[in-house]
Amino acid sequence: MTQVSVPQNDAVVLSTVRILAGKKGSPPSSVGTGFFYRADNGNITNSRVVIMTNKHVVEGSDYINFTITSSNNLYEMGKGGQPANRNDLTHHVDIIRNISPEIDNYFPHPSDEIDLCAIDISSIFMSRLQNSLKVRAHLIDSNDLMTEDEEVTVAHVEQIMVCGYPTGLWDSTNNMPISRVGHTATNMLTDFNGKREFLVDMPIFGGSSGSPVFRYEVPMYKTSASNLSLGGRIKLAGIIWGTLNKTQYGEIKIIEVPTGEKPMAAYQTNLSLGIAHPASTIKELASIIGNRINEVQSCEPNLIKR
């Protein structure tokens, strides 16, 4: 496997993917965000490459389209960290549900209260490699999750980075997402109002559904509750799924982040608070996928690592 080292904050940005979803025979009708994740059964050489996103991003859709950037040489980087002779190719993947464990490529989180799913795209990565191309991507995996020692240092307010495609906006020339830095509004490890979610102090718009939330400790990170070390540490903290709005009657409404051209009622005011499921829910879904690894061909692509 060929890997190219890039700065950590650049690597995690390369984990995102812009998702277009639609019905069979029709053009895409919704847009959302996903991120590449490598799920394995304890053996990193025997893994699946999936796109993690929200269930509501692909609900009612028969397929997704997304663009992957690849090159025959990731070592030759131009301005902005773009590989020389890069090739952007849009891929079409049919969503296969409830056929058989050997055929299905759609993995929903088993809880109806968790808006999280994964779509297996291992074959797409393999096809790129078979053409002697290397993928400009960072696959998030268990190494990007916080350890128990790192969780001990989590405070109520932490700096975070959210990468995605608000209102579908993206850098289409370079196939790059929009990245923003903000803070948590509630503790990322504590269930908000008894539900497995936390709040982020950041405006969340349509198209942001499925955006990864990273604990963004730059330029210093905590080694304990009271000690800091120079350097950076970025860990997956969760995934965006909703936002909080206020009605003209003063009621606070929780809504899924819209994925299509659905106008929001004028009497609703966005509170600039997003809702995210914690990384533990992603870990659970990855474990479910890992338990089925031996049923499919393994995939270990050439990647950018951090």
Locations of the language-model features?
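A conserved glycine-rich beta-strand in the N-terminal activation segment of trypsin-fold
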Residues: 22-50
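Long protein-protein interaction modules used by eukaryotic assembly/scaffold proteins
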Residues: 6-9, 37-39
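Histidine-centered active-site/metal-ligand motif
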Residues: 56
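Cytochrome P450 catalytic-core helices
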Residues: 53
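C-terminal subregion of chymotrypsin/trypsin-like serine protease catalytic domains
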Residues: 9-12, 215-306
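Residue-level recognition of beta-strand microenvironments
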Residues: 37-39, 187, 216, 242
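Serine endopeptidase catalytic core focused on the charge-relay Asp
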Residues: 13-18, 22, 30-31, 46, ...
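N-terminal targeting leaders that route proteins to membranes or the secretory/organellar pathways
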Residues: 1-4
